[in-house]
A protein has these predicted regions:
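C-terminal catalytic domain of Rieske-type non-heme iron oxygenases
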Residues: 39, 115-344
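A short, aromatic/hydrophobic, helix- or strand-capping loop or linear motif
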Residues: 2, 12, 58, 161-170
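Hydrophobic, proline/glycine-rich low-complexity stretches
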Residues: 1-6, 22, 335
Length: 344
């Protein structure tokens, strides 16, 4: 169950060069390469003759030559050469092409109707080019888990109390009530935890001493993009609608879930903070801590995937699942509408 008319993060732009890179997204095999001018191309990774992957062929200029009989395809998927029958290119010799663009250091691919691929629909990342904000390098994980279990996890601030004891946990993460807010693009689960010590991950990063007011803002947007915002401010200064004070510390974790298949997901992430823009040591420290936490998530989620697929007994929901259930219903409705439109 995938939403296709959406931009998905394929990977870091820096990882796609003048080579043929085989990928699988939403169960579809794709080959990605760059034209000589650097612009990205994404094509169906199967020659229409005998379905040899085009990624097994050669990149020649701005075209791909199949490694079996030399059928050659341009960036739009049109066959432009058939060496075994010069001057007689088969009319049906073409492959599907996918819109692809670079933005925010990521390569984005549109998996649905190419006519609907508006670049303005790419998920916006605020302050990306602001020199006063610091940014980690981030990373890429592949998790043997359906992307929706990961989305559930990223709408669940409470799990940090048990899964991330040494990093994102802290007083109040286990029992302070959660709020749920519906947005045009998804769901936010949030809460302010007041007058408590900062979590271990942030204790050395905040710019003040003593207890804090802490915001956990877990936002999930279609098709599967999470914006997790952590705000730390001196105790007594935080809360809904409160103006930031000079000591307010903000870190935003951007998480992009791109389904490979129904049981495997590519997880791309980086962090953006409102302090220490040039401090490489802090960036590395934060990157390593986040990577460790995401490995902890992977260990749990891969077992959840196996357990939910194998065990025929009934699974229950808890109150903390309200946001995840709301997001799933929202996404299912969009997928149903998309399917109905495609069949009309």
């Amino acid at each position: 169950m995938f939403l296709r008319n959406a931009w998905y993060a394929a990977g870091w732009s820096r990882d796609y060069e003048r080579t043929l890179t085989a990928e699988t997204f939403l169960g579809e095999e794709i080959v990605i390469f760059r034209r000589e001018d650097g612009s990205p191309v994404a094509l169906q990774d199967a020659c229409p003759h005998r379905k040899l992957p085009l990624s097994f062929g050669q990149l020649k200029g701005d075209t791909v030559e199949c490694g079996y009989h030399g059928l050659t395809f341009d960036g739009g998927g049109r066959c432009v050469a058939a060496p075994t029958q010069p001057g007689s290119i088969p009319r049906r010799a073409r492959v599907k092409s996918y819109p692809a663009i670079d933005r925010y250091g990521l390569l984005w691919i549109w998996m649905g109707d190419p006519e609907a691929a508006d670049p303005d629909l790419v998920f916006p990342i605020e302050n990306f080019d602001d020199p006063s904000w610091g940014r980690t390098d981030g990373g890429v994980l592949e998790i043997d888990c359906n992307y929706l279990w990961i989305c559930d996890n990223l709408l669940d601030p409470s799990h940090v109390a048990w899964v991330h004891v040494g990093s994102f946990a802290g007083s109040g993460t286990d029992d302070v009530p959660l709020e749920v807010t519906r947005t045009e693009r998804g769901v936010i689960v949030w809460r302010w935890i007041r007058g408590r010590p900062p979590s271990p991950y942030y204790a050395e990063l905040v710019k003040f001493d003593g207890p804090c007011d802490r915001l956990q803002h877990y936002e999930m947007c279609v098709p599967g993009i999470a914006l997790n915002k952590s705000v730390y401010t001196p105790a007594g200064t935080g809360g809904p609608g409160a103006a930031p004070v000079p000591e307010t510390y903000v870190n935003i974790s951007y998480n992009f879930m791109t389904p490979i298949s129904a049981e495997r997901t590519r997880y791309i992430w980086f962090q953006h903070r409102n302090t220490d823009p040039q401090d490489a040591t802090i960036s590395q420290q934060m990157n390593e801590g986040a990577r460790q936490a995401f490995e902890e998530d992977r260990a749990v989620l891969e077992r959840v995937q196996r357990g939910m697929a194998r065990d025929g007994s009934e699974a229950i929901d808890l109150g903390l699942d309200a946001g995840a259930k709301l997001f799933r219903r929202h996404l299912e409705r969009l997928i149903d509408e998309e399917s109905a439109g495609a069949g009309a």
